[in-house]
Amino acid sequence: MAWKVSVDVDTCIGDAICASLCPDVFEMGDDGKAHPVVETTDLDCAQEAAEACPVGAITLEEA
């Protein structure tokens, strides 16, 4: 199943756990916030990263 990945940069606190858990999907931007590097993914790590985000800034929707 493919997932559409988004990060609410207003909510993101720059913890970087998502980029550590799933570097193929998330990267840290120059603004210190997480940003998806792909629009959709089927990687399980994206869900793991969303669950690990301490502020719930990551949203996954069925693509």
Swiss-Prot record:
The keyword Cell inner membrane does not apply. Residues 3-31 form the 4Fe-4S ferredoxin-type domain. Keywords: 3Fe-4S, 4Fe-4S, Disulfide bond, Electron transport, Iron, Iron-sulfur, Metal-binding, Repeat, Transport. [4Fe-4S] cluster binds at C12, D15, C18, C53. SUPFAM superfamilies: 4Fe-4S ferredoxins. Disulfide bonds join C22-C45. This is Ferredoxin. It comes from Thermococcus kodakarensis (strain ATCC BAA-918 / JCM 12380 / KOD1) (Pyrococcus kodakaraensis (strain KOD1)).
